[in-house]
């Protein structure tokens, strides 16, 4: 992978928009919006300067297209409609006791949030439950052929990507997400708490509460029975 010199961002963006205008589409996905320095002695650019240049180009792109950005930093938030690859777990350093969805609570309602690929997680079922707990939409990264064809290539990180192997899991995950989060994607999160051992509750600004149970048995909490390894949604006004 080669990095484009920050000083070339403007020219590259203008050329891209000119060519891209020929394609009838309303959205654009940006793989990377990283900031970095350029130590060219004839045109040195610092990271803060790169950030300013990048924001100017994102503003141009956002005027023409809806933007999906992968793991964007705070400097991209104002221009992002969809963010993909959003982390849903902590580093698990020794001093970390719990994982808190701080980013999701800040951004939910202002943009759509998608997880990192569920099929590449160590436990796909837990990853789907965590996505729903955090109000995110599940993402899968699949290939038409079996992932074994990628052996000895530059794409060995897609170690479990064969679509036919994941088809039923994908349908089940999207069905669960739709039932649990329909109508909530545009709502802000007002509270996230642990309601019981391995049971978490996320409250949205419309009053709905989504309970996620990671236990292998049903749990009754706040007067509701949350199914094992499942979800219960308390709709605003329901008892």
At which residue positions do the language-model features occur?
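Active-site-proximal substrate-binding groove within the catalytic cores of carbohydrate-active enzymes
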Residues: 1-239
């Amino acid at each position: 992978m080669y990095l484009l010199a920050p000083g070339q961002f403007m020219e590259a963006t203008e050329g891209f928009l000119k060519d891209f205008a020929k394609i009838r589409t309303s959205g654009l996905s940006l793989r990377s919006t990283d900031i970095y320095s350029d130590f060219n002695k004839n045109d040195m650019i610092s990271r803060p300067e790169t950030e300013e240049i990048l924001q100017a180009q994102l503003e141009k792109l956002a005027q023409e297209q809806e933007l999906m950005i992968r793991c964007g930093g705070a400097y991209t938030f104002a221009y992002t409609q969809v963010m993909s690859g959003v982390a849903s777990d902590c580093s698990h350093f020794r001093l970390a006791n719990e994982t808190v969805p701080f980013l999701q609570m800040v951004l939910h309602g202002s943009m759509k949030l998608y997880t990192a690929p569920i099929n590449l997680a160590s436990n796909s079922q837990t990853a789907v439950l965590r996505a729903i707990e955090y109000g995110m939409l599940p993402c899968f990264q699949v290939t038409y052929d079996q992932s074994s064809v990628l052996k000895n290539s530059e794409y060995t990180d897609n170690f479990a990507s064969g679509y036919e192997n994941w088809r039923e899991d994908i349908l089940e995950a999207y069905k669960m997400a739709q039932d649990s989060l329909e109508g909530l994607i545009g709502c802000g999160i007002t509270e996230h708490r642990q309601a019981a051992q391995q049971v978490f509750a996320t409250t949205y600004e419309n009053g709905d509460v989504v309970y996620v149970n990671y236990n292998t048995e049903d749990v009754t909490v706040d007067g509701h029975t949350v199914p094992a390894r499942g979800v219960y949604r308390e709709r605003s006004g329901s008892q």
